Regions:
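Short aromatic-glycine motifs in intrinsically disordered, low-complexity regions
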Residues: 37-50, 137-144, 214
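C-terminal motif of bacterial Sec signal peptides marking the signal peptidase cleavage site
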Residues: 28-31
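Surface-exposed amphipathic alpha-helical segments
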Residues: 55, 195-230
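Soluble non-cytosolic domains of exported or imported proteins
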Residues: 46, 120, 124, 207, ...
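Conserved polar/disulfide-associated segments of primarily extracytoplasmic proteins
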Residues: 61-193, 198
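Proline-anchored loop/turn motifs at beta-strand termini and strand-loop-strand connectors
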Residues: 44-66
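Bacterial N-terminal signal peptides that target proteins for export
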Residues: 2-19
Length: 230
């Protein structure tokens, strides 16, 4: 009867296989790399946005100072949650509110609306949240030498009705802010069914920047999501 001989892997072979497995795992993890996006989440108000990891958050205190908030008030007392991001190497509120954003800068927020003010938010009011966009607001800005904006060009304007009571407006337009170069603004605003919450988002940068980074900006814009409960 033939004798079957069992061959054991030598210690060297076993160790080599183990090293290969570890190397493959390391390569797999390295291939995954760091996340491409930062996920901005407001779970309470079910509001979501994703921005490239190269867009860094603007300091909250700097934002408070730029907007003029009382720093002693809590988010709940303000009735406002917001975050701001900037793709510039030196993130600053100036890139959101100043004459020029050389790289994309974005703002996302949710405002609680007092019951006494809930009837005041028309679609045009949503259009004019950050800049004068509606015809009446533009006319007023043109007549006001202190408005700080000029050379308006409307690129697109779309009424949004995603369902579950949400309704809003998505507007894309160009403006010159102060003496700066032309800026491209892309903004979206929603109201919930009883107008108790205002969801807002905008991103801006110079027209040259926008042309160069349109796909990147478009991915951020399309990621802005509100999941209002029924």
């Amino acid at each position: 009867m033939p004798i079957r001989t069992r061959h054991r892997s030598s210690p060297v072979t076993a160790r080599a296989l183990l090293l290969l497995a570890v190397a493959a795992l390391v390569a797999l993890v390295a291939g995954c790399g760091s996340p491409d996006y930062t996920y901005v989440t407001n779970s309470t108000d079910r509001t979501y946005l994703k921005v490239p990891t190269t867009w860094r958050q603007i300091d909250g205190k700097a934002m408070d100072d730029a907007i003029g908030f009382d720093p002693t008030l809590t988010e709940e007392e303000r009735g406002l949650w917001f975050e701001a991001y900037d793709a510039d190497s030196a993130p600053s509120p100036v890139h959101l509110f100043g004459p020029s954003a050389p790289a994309p800068a974005a703002f996302v927020g949710v405002q609680q609306i007092p019951e006494t003010a809930r009837g005041q938010f028309s679609l045009d009011r949503l259009r004019d949240l950050f800049y004068p966009v509606s015809p009446s607001a533009r006319q007023a800005a043109e007549l006001d030498p202190t408005s700080g904006v000029s050379d308006f060009v409307l690129v697109s304007d779309e009424v949004l009705t995603p369902g579950k009571g949400l309704h809003g407006v998505h507007s894309v337009f160009r403006y010159r802010v102060g003496d700066g170069p032309m800026q491209m603004m892309d903004q979206t605003a929603y109201l919930n069914d009883d107008a108790s919450k205002l969801y807002m988002f905008f991103v801006r940068c110079s027209t040259e920047c926008y042309e160069q980074r349109q796909r990147e900006i478009g991915n951020v814009v399309s990621s802005f999501t509100v999941r209002e409960t029924t």
